Structures are given as C-alpha cells and as structure tokens.
Amino acid sequence: MSKIFVNPSAIRAGLADLEMAEETIDLINRTIEDNQAHLQGVPIEVEALPEDMKKLQISDHQQGQPSGGATGQDGSEEEDFYMTESENPYIPFQSYLDAVGIQLVRKMKTGEGFLKIWSQAAEEIVSYVAINFPLPADKESAEKSTQTVGEPLKSNSASNTPNKRSKPSTSTDLKAQEASGPHGIDWAASNDEDDASVEAEIAHQIAESFSKKYKFPSRSSGIFLWNFEQLKMNLDDIVGGAKEIPGVIRMAKEGNKLPLRCILGGVALTHSKRFQVLVNSEKLGRIMQEDLNKYLAN
C-alpha cells in the first residue's frame, strides 16, 4: 500500500494563503460598509432639485396655465429615506461573498492552484463592487452632493392677468424656464394633446423593456444600472410621468420608438429618492438631451 507524503511547508503556505484571502474579504466588507454609511445614517431630505420635471416643461401654453405636474407630491417627498432590508445592497453582497468562498474551497479540493483560483475570484469581486457600489469622491463632496439646492421656481403671475398681457409674457417665461432647467438641456420638442392610443403605445414600449437595465452616471466616476421594476410604481403612473417629458407624446402618436432610458431617468429622478442619491444630475441631463435629440431626429 502506497503512502502519500504531504510537505508541511506546503500546508503552511496554503493556510497562509487562506488567511490572506479572509483578510482581503474582511477588508472589502469594511470598505463597502464605510462607503454605504451615508445610506444607513440620518435620512436625506431633498428639498428642491434643479432636475425636477416641473422645470423641464416647454412654455407652449397660450393662456399661461401652469402644468399639472406641479401639484401634489409633497406628501411623498416628505417621506424619510430609510433603506429596507430588501433594498440594502450590502445583504446580497454578503451572500455573494459567501458563495465565492464556497466556490474557492471546492476548487481547492480539486487540486487547482490557489493563486489562479483567487485571481479569478478577485476579478469577479472587483467587477461586482464596481457595478453595485460606486465609490464617492470624498466625504465632503458626498455630503454636499446629497443636499442639492435648486433655484426656486418663479410664480407665473401671467395666469391671473388679462389676455392682452399674456402675449408679451411668453418670451420671459421661456427664458425663465430655460434658466431653471438642468445643465446642458434645451428642450426643443413640445408635447401635443394625447389620447388613449398614445398612452397605450407608451405603456406597450415600456412594458416590453420593463426589466431591462440601463446605464446611468453615478455621483462617482462610475456607473450604475437601473430599470423600471426598481421604481416600484404602477405602469399607469410611469406612463403619466413619461408624458411630462417633452416630445414623448409626439413620438408615441407617430408610432416611433421612444427614448426609454430618457423616460426612465426622468421618472426616477422625480419619484425615486434612492435614484436621486446615486445619480449624477449634470451628466444625466446631458444624456437625456442626447437621447431626445437622437430619437426626435429619426
């Protein structure tokens, strides 16, 4: 009967590698926990956003009437931002690390080299963290960026004036709305009156891509993925928010393909506080404008 001799130095080296792997995973956990501290602490109150959809309207009113989107979301805006257990990204990441550890042990039992196994696992962990946990630039920029301050909307006094004064005020209204919109956005398309067929077309295109994830710029230099399911809204409410984006009704009435990423970004920016915390508003404004220009040109 043959005997298999194991070199004690090889066992010590393997144990040292395992300890190094455990320390690396613990370091990643602590880093992510520190970076997510601003999501677990005091709730963030967003008083006013320059990207609010009320400011993206086009002054195409003949009677200077304010848009209907300017009413009634104070109750939902005042809700405190607390992450539930299902929304906490740290919990699925912990499960992911546990699964990676199990895979490491199984591969090592088959006789594969630890360095090769760990290099592959490290690449997977780094890619997972880069996608799901974009790092903030620093604490100061994070604190300043989470509290966005927008210019207050000027009240439209022309709605209470006679019709004779409504025509001269249209040019000033256009300038005020252009100044209050997001950086780099110049809305050139207006929404026409819609009907049931338009709503059906918008709902159909959104439903087809309801679970598709789109890339959005984060407050750090990275990106994050978002889809319509994460809005946790009814399809009718999403369609209502999409109709407030200039040009969407016109494209739907003509049967053209809709800029779904632009629609998702606009609706999420208004209704999702978590999206507001993660997204880079300036870059999002440029992306939404580029998508609108691209789809309107077709």
Curated annotation (Swiss-Prot):
GO cellular component, one term: virion component
Post-translational modification: Phosphorylated by host PKC and by an unknown kinase.
GO molecular function, one term: RNA-directed RNA polymerase activity
Pfam families: PP_M1 (PF03012)
PTM sites of type Phosphoserine: 211, 272
Compositional bias (Polar residues): 144-174
Region span, Disordered: 57-79, 141-190
Keywords for the protein's UniProt record, in alphabetical order: Chaperone, Host cytoplasm, Host nucleus, Host-virus interaction, Inhibition of host innate immune response by virus, Inhibition of host interferon signaling pathway by virus, Inhibition of host STAT1 by virus, Inhibition of host STAT2 by virus, Interferon antiviral system evasion, Phosphoprotein, Viral immunoevasion, Viral RNA replication, Virion
Motif (Nuclear export signal): 49-58
GO terms (BP aspect): symbiont-mediated suppression of host innate immune response; symbiont-mediated suppression of host JAK-STAT cascade via inhibition of STAT1 activity; symbiont-mediated suppression of host JAK-STAT cascade via inhibition of STAT2 activity; symbiont-mediated suppression of host type I interferon-mediated signaling pathway; viral transcription
Residue window of motif Nuclear localization signal: 212-215
CDD domains listed in its UniProt record: RABV_P-protein-C_like
InterPro entries: PP_M1-like (IPR004259), PP_M1_C (IPR037199), RABV_P-like_C (IPR049506)
Record function comment: Non catalytic polymerase cofactor and regulatory protein that plays a role in viral transcription and replication. Stabilizes the RNA polymerase L to the N-RNA template and binds the soluble protein N, preventing it from encapsidating non-genomic RNA. Also inhibits host IFN-alpha and IFN-beta signaling by binding and retaining phosphorylated STAT1 in the cytoplasm or by inhibiting the DNA binding of STAT1 in the nucleus.
Family statement drawn from the similarity comment of this UniProt entry: Belongs to the lyssavirus protein P family.
Subunit organization: Homotrimer when phosphorylated. This trimer is stabilized by binding to the L protein. Binds soluble protein N, and ribonucleocapsid. Interacts with host STAT1, STAT2 and PML.
Protein name according to UniProt: Phosphoprotein
Annotated source species: Irkut virus (IRKV)
